[in-house]
Amino acid sequence: MLNKTYTYPTYEAGRHLALKKIQGSIVNLNLIRLKEFADYSDFPDIAPETTISGYEAFMSYIQLAKPFVEQTGGEILLVGKGGRFLIGPENEQWDICMLIKQKSVSDFFAFEQNPDYMKITGHRSASILDSRLLPLEMLSF
């Protein structure tokens, strides 16, 4: 049996997030597993002239996405090299871990639906083998 991979949120997952009615900021925890080589076969208009690694394609995506994140009041808090869990499944590892802060869920959705942002998401798709995205609601303590 093949392991299921995840690269984009489902409609139901987005609906669930919207219905939570989170007030204030969220921080999105992103776990990314990269392809060895980027696959631009579905995105020939933005493909580089030579083959590049999944890492290089993903870093291009981050550089191009950063202004869109910031336009909606968001901030890239961390882009870090992943690896194996200290606590968690021993056979599971992630290449890149990110924390992205957004002012609100609606600002996050506005960022994701920006037509100009959508033009660069091919770099993300070309680079990612699997991913997880967990929106975190800020708690007071």
Where would I find each of the regions flagged by the language model?
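Short S/T/G/P-rich N-terminal loop/turn motif that feeds into the first structured element of a domain
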Residues: M1-I96, K103, D107, E137-F141
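Short, Lys/Arg-rich amphipathic alpha-helical interaction segments
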Residues: G88, L99-K101, V105-F141
